Amino acid sequence: MIVIKRDGSKEPVRFEKVSNRIKKMTYGLNPDHIDSLEIAQKVIAGIYDGISTQELDNLAAETAASLIPNHPDYSILASRIAVSRLHKTTKKKFSETIEDLYNYIDPETNMPAGLINDHTYGVVMKNKQKLDGAVIHERDFNFEYFGFKTLEKSYLLKTHGETTETPQHMYMRVAVGIWGDDFKNVIKTYELLSNHLMTHATPTLFNAGTKKPQLSSCFLLMMSDDSIPGIYKTLSDVAVISQNAGGIGLAIHNVRSTGSYIKGTNGTSNGIVPMLRVFNETARYVDQGGGKRKGSFAIYIEPWHADIEYFLDLRKNTGKEELRARDLFLALWTPDLFMQRVKDSGEWSLFSPSDVPGIWELYGDDFEKAYLEAELSGKARKTIKARDLWTKIIDSQIETGTPYMLYKDAANKKSNQQNLGTIKSSNLCTEILEYTDKDEQAVCNLASIPVNKFLKSTDNRTSKIARGKCEVDHKALYDVSYQTAINLNKVIDVNYYPTKETERSNTRHRPIGIGIQGLADLFAIIGIPFTCLEAKKINEEIFETIYFAAMVASVDLAKKEGKYESFEGSPLSKGQFQFNLWGFNDKDLSGRWDWHKLRKDVMKHGARNSLLLAPMPTASTAQIMGNNEAFEPFTSNIYTRRTLSGEFILVNKHLVRELISLGLWSDNMKNLIILNKGSVQNIPQIPEALREIYKTVWEIKQKDLIDMSAGRGKFICQSQSLNLFIENVNAAKLTSAHFHSWELGLKTGMYYLRTKSAVDAISGLGIDMEKAKKYRETSEEKIPTPVKENAEEKIDMLGMTSEELSKAAEDIMSDIVCSLDNPDDCLACGS
């Protein structure tokens, strides 16, 4: 058979050449579990006469990917093969790549269609040698397969329909796009990105250095005015923001309710629903960057609004279509008074904003006083039992996963922006809390830190990270957090702003948002259960370090560049850090950092940024870096990815390595985990201690996750994207979770509600369930470490042969398939 090379020449396919090429890529991988010969044999079996070298590489990469269940290192091998193919079709020098992107000519119009802005191009061209020499191409070979494929599909810039950038070129483009000719910070940023020690958010990776560098993730708006000009101005603004790939949070507390008098026309209002349907269609029409994805709007409303019941039905599957707006995300901006009325089984009054003007500008005692006065003066459009409205909220959440639950009073009382006025909403993902009004539309630029990369050995004999012999390296975490804050502050200055109101807000208050990813990975590497006391302590100390480092960076910036414009009057100006607003003092913290000195510095010099931390979902960037999302536990221990050539199984890489070390990893063990839909709790051959570590989010008490959110909350000056995962959900369970969040003082009580029915994962698959149950009751034996015997002999098959077990696993696979083309349908890779 003949293979066609890139230059068009032909040569015979040789097994040795294929095998040697694959073997070269296995450096540093586990030689006991990576079989390059097996891959080569499968590749040879799959080729055809006239195959191109590029198709041959694709076949080899996906063949290696199909073996990922055998060992996680196959993911790195598959990625290396794919990266090697990309390197053959792209320029080696960063400057040449930038030149190609800058000089790109649209093939259809034959007009210039360059992707790089003049400033970035000029900096690169003047400093070719320095920048080209700083790029370390070998780091492209450190990606896992699906991380690289995500980059290739959506992030790396393309010309003529082909990928033009390599990952390292993208990282250098981002560094130069942010820092220009400040080469010290360019190199620092490149090194952090390239070594996967931090990542900027998706819009920054997409757009840094390009013609329109819109680098911000989040935008918050208040309805400009309750009038046709005000509503349509806001509609125009959200359309422009959405066009530039921003996610939107919009507060509509000030829009009058159904039946309210309209003075200008002597008519009555149709309420919020017809208006929101217009916003719904705008979200659908104005997609983000020419068909990448639909626009995303979260609509915030307070529960005293007289149209609240219509609002709660907007996303439901049943009912009149003219009363639905299913492409909008819904959120409640909930005052303490409502929660107290629900708790006390009290009455709840609903008002039209036109009857209680300005009440949305109040919180705490001022809001309660105005609300009670409005009740006493008979302004309510309707009075209902608070628990009846609560039931409707719970029903909507169980059916649709929304509305999000945010607590207005906690958000304002614990905000460093409280001197500006009342915060009226959060953003699309519930982690941003910033002030908005008709003249200011809030913006936030984000980055996240993979905390699992910040571990150091506690064994003096080796620097190797081993389970039970490592701890968090707070010094390294401090250094990266410091530079991340410096970077995000710079993004504010080089960012493209879609409206004048966004520019005014961001340059006056200069908020940033630092989050994390890989917390579950960190606990797995250390070898502790997600919600144990040690994990809770580590969780808090990680966020204390990040907050301290970011605050030091902001004070240092203030010394050089001045404090942010609205600093005076803020809690920080009075020496109050976020934990002080939660009622904690310096002595309540770890003792690791000198908060007393920092307090004196911030009161003397000010801070450059009003807000610093905002742990966000990190769905895409965590996948790129091969980490579990944000601060969440593992959703499952096994799931699949679908690509053009078929479905691939992904198994929790930490679990696989543990099982290999115990001699327990095999096809039968893999199939048992599949039958249990990613849970290991009903597999008694796995030691109990290991099962505790690898509990999925469905098997962890939500109370513990809420407690951990409160624990780190005292260091989070914005908020956090806290999802709730409740199996077999009912009103009592969900109500209990909400009230626990509220009573602990969380700002975000719930982002999405994720639910599933509590059905035995292996029922209905021809398995002898009685035998399985009996086995589980009698076989809670501890497996010695390591197990030397053949793992296959240790696995009880629940009354099935290996073939039957494999077939049953295949039958259940379709339920847990995730497509790279449609990730929104998968709970395993984020919201």
What is each residue range found by the language model?
Residues 9, 32-172:
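Core nucleic-acid recognition elements
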Residues 18-25, 232-241, 256, 267-280, ...:
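Extended active-site and interfacial segments that coordinate phosphate-rich ligands
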Residues 51, 66, 142-156, 194-208, ...:
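Core structural elements
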Residues 59, 69, 93, 139-284:
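Long, structured ligand/cofactor-binding scaffold of large enzymes
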Residues 85-90, 94-137, 216-463, 467-474, ...:
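Active-site cavity-forming subdomains of large catalytic enzyme subunits
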Residues 120, 124-150, 430-436, 488-493, ...:
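Catalytic alpha/beta core of large soluble enzyme barrels
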Residues 480-503, 507, 511, 529-618, ...:
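Internal maturation/activation junctions in enzymes
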Residues 763-831:
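Acidic, low-complexity intrinsically disordered tails
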